[in-house]
């Protein structure tokens, strides 16, 4: 019991330190006068619409987790699914290339009784649905507005095309794992043999066999889980619909900012598709939250649309898409740490360890 108290004390200290660091980070990054001025200049109804878009983004991502876990036979209630979503968003926002979210999501689901293998398969399925929605909107947006992009600055277009290509390749890899696992294993084997053929590896006597075996195990496990999880076609349709709704909601924030500053004349779908393309281009930058590329890309893509409100609208957009997610996600991190169910499970383990065991000698 004393050990648990010490652990709780350190957890509380860590949470307080993290809260202070997060507050300092936000204070350093944002100009408070600009923030106040920006929101004071906006129409309240569009501020509410902007917040509503982000809430829809969170809720429909959570619904997607709920449907996917149902299809795998390990259903999560909505609140657990929302916690999984927000933990992923928070840790992705604070790590390079958004790489930190998935491990914490797998850990969270594992705590709820879902095996690590199944949790990984759930994450991959959710990831695939998001990529389908994102790539579909990206291809459509690029087909319609490639001329607008060229007019906004030719230097930006190669990054956007590369970002779209990488998203397509990522989607293709996940799809191959699900539909044609042997193809992906064959391609992966060729790539790994090529990588391990580099002098850096050969000089150390490293062989690709271990990496190839790990790839085979992962792909085969995911394919098995996919076959099981894809039996319920209705849940697949629901999950895919949720992915499109959350993607469109997230990509509508720039339009809410546009209308909030009293601007009109640009159709909704144009502003929305340009935000999709901005997301694809900025995703190449490995900084947390694609910092720098997101702001710079916004200023470049929208400079012909937002006029004198460009800087303020960018600030509002960034506050919603990044800092709001950071704040809400952190609240879920704290709530998850303080969840009474965690304490109950810890007490159960403690009581189980204190139960008297029979003494074989006495018997």
Question: Where are these predicted regions, by residue range?
Answer:
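Short, membrane-interfacial amphipathic segments enriched in basic
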Residues: 197-222
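A short amphipathic helical element positioned immediately N-terminal to and/or at the very start
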Residues: 33-41, 109, 218-230
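Hydrophobic faces of transmembrane alpha-helices in multi-pass small-molecule transporters and flippases
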Residues: 47-51, 86-94, 124, 236-244
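Membrane-embedded helical hairpins/re-entrant loop segments and their flanking transmembrane helices
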Residues: 62-86, 257-274, 298
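Transmembrane helical segments that form the transport core of multi-pass membrane transport proteins
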Residues: 225-277
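Alpha-helical transmembrane segments of multi-pass membrane proteins
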Residues: 79-88, 269-280, 309-319
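Membrane-interface helix starts
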Residues: 8-10, 41-50, 227-241
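Transmembrane helix-loop-helix hairpins in multi-pass inner-membrane proteins
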Residues: 1-37, 88-203, 287, 291-363
């Amino acid at each position: 019991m004393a050990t648990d108290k010490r652990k709780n004390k350190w957890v509380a200290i860590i949470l307080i330190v993290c809260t202070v660091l997060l507050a300092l980070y936000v204070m350093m990054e944002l100009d408070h006068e600009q923030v106040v001025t920006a929101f004071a200049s906006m129409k309240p109804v569009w501020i509410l619409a902007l917040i509503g878009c982000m809430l829809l983004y969170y809720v429909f991502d959570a619904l997607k987790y709920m449907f996917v876990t149902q299809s795998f036979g390990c259903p999560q209630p909505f609140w657990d699914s929302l916690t999984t979503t927000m933990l992923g968003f928070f840790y992705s926002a604070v790590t390079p290339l958004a790489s930190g979210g998935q491990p914490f999501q797998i850990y969270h689901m594992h705590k709820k009784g879902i095996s690590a293998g199944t949790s990984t398969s759930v994450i991959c399925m959710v990831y695939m649905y998001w990529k389908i929605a994102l790539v579909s909107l990206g291809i459509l947006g690029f087909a319609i507005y490639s001329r607008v992009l060229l007019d906004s600055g030719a230097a930006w277009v190669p990054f956007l095309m590369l970002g779209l290509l990488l998203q397509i390749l990522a989607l293709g890899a996940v799809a191959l794992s699900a539909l044609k696992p042997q193809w992906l294993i064959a391609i992966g084997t060729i790539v790994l043999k090529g990588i391990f053929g580099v002098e850096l590896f050969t000089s150390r006597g490293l062989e690709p066999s271990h990496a190839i075996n790990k790839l085979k195990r992962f792909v085969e496990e995911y394919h098995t889980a996919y076959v099981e999880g894809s039996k319920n076609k209705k849940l697949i349709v629901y999950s895919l619909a949720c992915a499109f709704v959350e993607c469109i909601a997230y990509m509508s924030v720039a339009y809410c900012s546009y209308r909030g500053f009293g601007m009109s004349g640009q159709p909704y779908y144009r502003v929305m598709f340009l935000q999709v393309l901005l997301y694809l281009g900025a995703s190449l930058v490995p900084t947390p939250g694609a910092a720098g590329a997101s702001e710079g890309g916004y200023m470049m893509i929208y400079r012909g649309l937002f006029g004198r409100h460009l800087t303020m609208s960018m600030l509002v957009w960034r506050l919603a898409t990044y800092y709001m997610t950071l704040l809400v996600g952190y609240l879920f991190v704290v709530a998850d740490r303080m969840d009474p169910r965690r304490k109950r499970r810890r007490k159960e383990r403690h009581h189980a360890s204190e139960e008297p065991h029979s003494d074989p000698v006495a018997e």
